[in-house]
């Protein structure tokens, strides 16, 4: 079942905003960070239809709010539609998001799919629902993006999510990878964007409190947060308390990769290093030896 979507024609998003100086300072910071992310990774272009995935949590509310404000002032034209996947979790307040969208004149869909029952059936006893749930959720949302003609799918992951995913893969997956700010989905049909990539979680928490978003808890399914991710999140929070610049440095490292300083042979051709070494022209014997190797290689061709 889909809720009717209002047209972006005559778009009139003018919510009641806080008036405190703290709010406007934070808003300015978030706008700047989101704007830089959009520009740096070419996330949104003229004519795009951006599908914003809204769960009812602080991250997706903040993402939607900032993008809607950008739409009002952006020098390009793009459309926004909010989409919520109602997974039929017990106790899910079905009226909260429709009311919020309608009160703020936001075009939206409510996509109803009982992925909760499927998740319960497929999850082994004693395991958390998160892995299966997220796969089913992604599949449903990505397919729906195709149905409505969305050119970009906006997700609410922030800087700390990206860093946490990096450490999850490092500690438990044996790989150096995180969440890219922009990604082509595995089926090659959707462009995923994360406009909050430069935003810290603590700023999102403050912003959501100031804006008084009607937050829907994410643990309605009764499952506990993935233990490994929970431990890493706590580690990151402790680091941020003790060493305020550490997370900034880690995120910077994700943007400053040197393949030649790692050990991945698919990223760097270590076999050609000998041929790239500068010759010592002061040593005639060494020069003759190197030239003989080059001549032999040409003769072989």
Curated annotation (Swiss-Prot):
Its cofactor is Mg(2+); [4Fe-4S] cluster. It catalyses: cytidine(32) in tRNA + S-sulfanyl-L-cysteinyl-[cysteine desulfurase] + AH2 + ATP = 2-thiocytidine(32) in tRNA + L-cysteinyl-[cysteine desulfurase] + A + AMP + diphosphate + H(+). Its EC number is 2.8.1.-. The keyword ATP-binding applies. GO terms for biological process: tRNA thio-modification. Homodimer. Belongs to the TtcA family. This is tRNA-cytidine(32) 2-sulfurtransferase. The lineage of its organism: Bacteria, Pseudomonadati, Pseudomonadota, Gammaproteobacteria, Moraxellales. The gene is ttcA.
């Amino acid at each position: 079942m889909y809720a009717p979507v209002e047209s972006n024609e005559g778009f009139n998003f003018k919510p009641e905003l806080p008036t405190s100086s703290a709010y406007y300072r934070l808003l300015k910071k978030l706008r700047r960070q989101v704007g830089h992310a959009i520009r740096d990774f070419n996330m949104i272009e003229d004519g795009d239809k951006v599908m914003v995935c809204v769960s009812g949590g602080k991250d997706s509310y903040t993402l939607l709010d900032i993008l809607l404000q950008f739409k009002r002032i952006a020098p390009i034209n793009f459309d926004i539609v909010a989409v919520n996947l109602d997974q039929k979790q017990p106790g899910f307040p079905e009226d909260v998001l429709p009311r919020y969208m309608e009160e703020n004149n936001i075009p939206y869909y409510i996509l109803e799919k009982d992925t909760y029952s499927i998740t319960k059936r497929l999850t082994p006893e004693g395991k958390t629902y998160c892995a299966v749930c997220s796969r089913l959720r992604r599949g449903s949302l990505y397919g729906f993006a195709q149905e409505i003609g969305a050119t970009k799918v906006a997700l609410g992951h922030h800087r700390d999510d990206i860093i946490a995913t990096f450490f999850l893969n490092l500690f438990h997956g044996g790989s150096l990878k995180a969440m890219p700010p922009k990604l082509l989905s595995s089926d090659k049909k959707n462009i995923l964007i994360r406009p909050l990539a430069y935003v810290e979680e603590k700023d999102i928490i403050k912003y959501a409190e100031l804006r008084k978003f009607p937050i829907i808890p994410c643990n309605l399914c009764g499952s506990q947060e993935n233990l490994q991710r929970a431990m890493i999140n706590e580690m990151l929070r402790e680091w941020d308390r003790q060493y305020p610049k550490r997370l900034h440095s880690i995120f910077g490292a994700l943007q400053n990769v040197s393949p030649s300083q790692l050990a991945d042979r698919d990223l760097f051709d270590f076999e050609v290093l000998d041929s790239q070494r500068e010759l010592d022209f002061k040593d005639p014997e060494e020069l003759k030896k190197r030239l003989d190797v080059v001549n032999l290689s040409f003769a072989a061709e």
